[in-house]
Amino acid sequence: MESSRRPLGLTKPSALEIMEIEAEGISQSRLQLLNPIPGVWFPITLGFRALPNSRREKSFSLYKDRECLLPMESQLQSKRDIGIDTTDVLLKHLMASRSSYCPDGIFTISEQGPMLAQSMATISKELSGSQANRPTLRPLPILLKGTQVAMRLFLLGLRPVRFCLRVFMLKAQEGLHLLADLVRGHNPVGQIIALEAAPTSASLPLL
């Protein structure tokens, strides 16, 4: 005698349920989610991700304990598969909405700092076709602070600091020697250096 109870787990929808799904205009492929068994669907709500019941992990209960929203798809990801280049449009949209775009597709609305606003304004001018000079980076204050810290540590007599400074100086000298060898190996530059090194008539001693 067959049991009239509906078995737990993944079950194939009946013909009546399939007809109701088709009448609502929802395709069956959108209800099929990472299916290892052909012809079996997860009973999920459209736009939601169903998590398996923690109490019935072995039986995969049809009842959902929790539901979570699917992550929103960014404009660039949604239009990537149809072959449309939307990079320019997306940048202008991001600058207009004053939002910061993360590589994982999440938009976080936040106030821009002065440096970010200036760089975004420069990018917008370049996209519009007007000439704009990019702000040049100035690493001199950073180098000055680093040099001051290194000199203070050197004056304290720390042996690792002295060793690191010595290694940096040797590497810098090695780079200068390699650069000079490369300059000599290049014919046009070598000719220019030879012409500059040759004594001119003004530098010759008068007899």
Curated annotation (Swiss-Prot):
Name the record gives this protein: Protein I
KW Lipid biosynthesis (keyword) present: no
Transmembrane segments: none
The entry's keywords: Virion
Chief site of localization: virion
Pfam family, one: Corona_I
Top-level taxon: Viruses
Record's GO cellular component terms: virion component
Record-stated family: Belongs to the coronavirus I protein family.
Functional summary from the UniProt entry: Structural protein that is not essential for the viral replication either in tissue culture or in its natural host.
InterPro entries in the record: Corona_nucI (IPR004876), N2-like_embe-CoV (IPR044311)
Compartments reported by the entry: Virion
Other remarks in the entry: The gene encoding this protein is included within the N gene (alternative ORF).
